[in-house]
Amino acid sequence: MKYPRKWKLLLSLLAAVSVMLTGCSGGGLFAGFDMNNLMKPPKLTGSQSGIQQALEQSLKNKSYTLKYPKSGKERSAFIPVDFGKKGAAVLALYKQDGAKIHINVIVEQDGAYRSIDDIEGADSEVYAVQTADLDGDGSVEVIISWLTTSSSDKWLTVYSFDGEEAEHALSLKMEAGFTGMQIVDLDGDSQDELLLMQVDSTNKTAMATLYRLTPDGIDNEHMYKAMMDGNVSPRTTGASPYLDIKTAQLRSGINAVFVDGAKGSEYTITEVLYWNGSGLSNLFYDYTAESVVETMRPSSMLSMDINKDGWIEIPQVSELPGYFDKKASEKLWLTTWYRYDGRVDEETGKDAQKVLSCNINSTDGYYFSFPEEWVSKQSVTIERNSTDRTSSFYAYEWDGESFRRTDLLMTLRAFTSAVWENSGSNAGYEYLGEHGSVVYAVKISRSGADFGIDLDFVKENFVIMADL
């Protein structure tokens, strides 16, 4: 959101005071004090001091604790919101003796700040606060996600700002439970919608619902649903089964929401929700299997733009040569990335375009692309040494009786900057790049040169993941 200049200054000041008001004991000036229990917390100074005064006057100077969103861009207990033609306000999140957080609405009038409303929230912890114009009236709504104590699900409330003269400055437009959420213009009408994903872990079902709002509330005539895989489950207690949710184009002009979900500790799936012209669709949901099969992989790798071409690719994995009979914990993988554009051919199925195949070293933060010849002939494999931080590439070929690893072709290594600067440690290695305190380098053997590997080839296929 773009704030007016005065509100940008206000935001920076409130962020500073929020740090001062965190619920912990401090040293120095605040040594010996518990900030949660201060009757009169540290004051804002200058022209903005009236904001805190307005809050405390509305609370009749009783003690309170400021509450902070756990996630998202807005992390302050004081959140300035520009409501456009309806004005502007500061939303103060606080808690007193009750179980639930309150939202206090503070406005400026004739140079003075005053509280015009105070409403009880949905729960005791705020997960995130977002704003978007969901009903098309030119003024944003406030979307608050609340943590719940019973499960990994959350609760959502959407408020509209009705102005200073209304009985309540904030009015509730909708509320719903959800497991995953995205604000997105999915149907391409230049109006944001609310996409909620809900998992029923008891019945092993899941549903995505696309909500359109009007000034009167939910547009029930234009609410769209799509089935999702109900077998997703969180990997840690209290976590979401959805590992990542992002919006990107499926093809030119068609937005989609890419949802990476966990299936236990070992498997990951990607679901793609998009507008099919008349409703909401899940590209990969198999109604026969009642789950997502096509994108399931024994890997925690998420969908991403792996080659920086502007499109999201979805990974699939297969064992590198020589690792087929290894235990799962010992396997090294070749990850092949596919781009889908959402079109489905009756004969060939979904239009999947192979983008690249690579081995990913997630520990050291890089991947190396395999040429198609290496992939099709299964002619190269890797041995990894976590102690030396090396990945050694070997030829893999038929010896007359079986396939086996033969000549060392090259070694990729991650050095610390200090070790790299010691010429005795990096002998024979050639520089590839660096990130932070890590330097990446390669040593190419004579067999590797005979195999067609040179420094230009390595640089072309070596990618530092942090650069994506």
Predicted regions and their residues:
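Beta-propeller-forming repeat regions
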Residues: 19, 24-380, 386, 391-394, ...
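Sec-dependent N-terminal signal peptides of Gram-positive bacterial secreted proteins and lipoproteins
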Residues: 3-29
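Small/flexible residues
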Residues: 7-10, 214, 445
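C-terminal partner/receptor-binding element of secreted or periplasmic proteins
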Residues: 446-468
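Short, well-ordered beta-strand elements
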Residues: 437-447
